[in-house]
């Protein structure tokens, strides 16, 4: 203890003079025994006595949530449990304008590896009720270390508060269950990325790591409430090689708690353990997700273009229609509707020196690139004012790739060729994403495509995680995410979309922190096509911003009860809640359908910045049944919209309780398509229930705007 005090007091004392009061109302203070990070909404305090760090207070939403000082984190290193009070020595706490950086050194013992450091940066933004904590483990020494489990953040609060855990998975190609909700009353440890604790007021924890058995949320008998990772629960990811229920491509560790997997911290390297969000809320349980998404969408999620896109995969796929001559009429039709980005899916690349892995234009499909590496089709799109999007499988290559022939050492060994032998897969082999030379090459490919072809959006597909020699697939995942972030830094105005139609890629929050997610290829498992699209949005909202979900617009849906212009009025409002992407031959739309679609696109482009960041879920039933209503409320501070959808069943009129309204203000509610005003309501009336009428197989978009001052 004396040695620990000798180490921590000098740096903490020096930091006392470095306290910063930001003009934007975030305050970070540090002295010899305490650290505080707060704003006008929320505050968190830590004790630093003796080099041990404990969270002593979490104040917000009208109360104090910490019931006893508690460890800030737990981490199992080489089989030895450690916490912020055991096994580590605090080196320093450094205040920033909106943050505190805690630096720890692993305490020296006979068995502990030397030179291990843990850095935890806690960020609080102006007006936010959410603390964002990012943990990085650094090995400055000569020996590796194994990390089998850890918490990303934790606090001790009332042990008997009601709790709700939510676990997410992608994989719409094989399954429909993307969100799993578990209500808990006592101690528990569940798979999950979201944990809400409390009733009308409470706290929440969210993990930015992807879904999987290793992602954990829980609470012990003392009230220690946490979000973290337990790698020992995970065994293997089959990727596209296994798609059968109930486990699909997951293989949990059958020997747990005996570990099969752990993260390996290599000498002179670091591991990004992940980011967690701890926040407080009040005003009802629905306000928890609203508080999170306001912070996440405003600061973490990149400000990519929420453009209206078309993607060529449906209906042309890999066929002859995927060509310059066939697609020019689609460009003209898209331009007339107001579509902004034209994305060429798989098969724009090809030919000698152009296959997947080489990433050059197929001269048979898109001629003209022989001279300047830019096909005539790209010039034609520029002339029409259309942006270009390109599909890529950045981590996989065709066996005919000349790049692979020149650099076979870039392939993932020993499993790099396995998927190429699978008749159910795309016949692609796998690069080693952790290879620095390959990383530089792929970054160069993206640089070239942006420079030569003005690519505005990439869709990255086939991101199976694999073990490569001495790197496991968690290393592989982190290497890929790191590459995409480097691409974003180089090209901040380019959108990077990840395909999440297979499970265990990056969904939900790791993917959303990068950009939109292509979520659904239209594979049905007993439901109608429209019901599945509604279900996709229902599964994401309210915690995952639905604007990040990419779905096929008019993909076999403008038929039957959704035919004609009325079908457009029922379907395009759903597209506006998502990353709107047409999957259809636009030249087949009738004149009435084209006119109605163009009206909605123009309205969306004029108002899309008003959708959110919070999106409340107004109906509880899963619309996958094809009968239930589904309704959402995008809300941007004091105003927003109601999107209501009715399928085959349900009443003609439903009462939808709105959230986020000021009960003492007056609001005008209007139909955005007709311009008709439904009425003027007090906020208290809207909170009690707004009556909304929708015909069967129909939709309605209502504007909710405040009138005058409060």
List each language-model region with its residue ranges.
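Short Pro-Gly-centered flexible turn/kink motifs
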Residues: 263-282, 642, 696-705
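Carbohydrate-binding surface patches
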Residues: 41, 213-217, 622-663, 701-703
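Polysaccharide-binding surfaces and accessory modules of carbohydrate-active proteins
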Residues: 20-38, 42, 54-238, 666, ...
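Glycan-recognition surfaces
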Residues: 405-440, 444, 482-588
